[in-house]
Amino acid sequence: MTSDAVPTTREPFDPTDVSWTPVSRRLIGARLTVAAFFLVPLLLAALAGAILAGEAWVWAFPAAVVLLGLWIGWLVPRQVGAMGYAERADDLLVRSGIMFRSMVVVPYGRMQYVDVNAGPLARKFGIATVQLHTAAPATGAAISGLPPHEAARLRDRMASRGEARLAGL
């Protein structure tokens, strides 16, 4: 292998010394429900338009909506599967993305506060979001799709680690 060979590792987004915790698979159902909330009325409108128009080419619109729904149904499980977090000694890592990967490193000492959110749909699916707030908005992070007990545990752990790191300043 030459020095200009393309590396096969995902090192910047998947450090080898880290044990990732995945988010709950229930996030898939929540995201697909939101997609269906928008796609079903759009499909009904496209079908009504195609029926009323009486032109064969207009059926391309309902077909496009169906294809979009199938693509979302294929994509969402993969997106959720790529999401995770890892707690290290001095920071929290949060990763997401398939094509456009992202990994945010949040130092415990930079955290100002941590909160847990769960809207009606999230509660129905038994998931919550942990939001980490820092002084710089770019270093904050959110972890969606956590079971409520794990979200509360992570919130308390991050808050206590943040206080311990700030006390050392």
Residue ranges and their predicted role:
Residues 1-169:
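N-terminal basic, Ser/Thr-rich segments that initiate or prime the first beta/alpha elements at protein or domain
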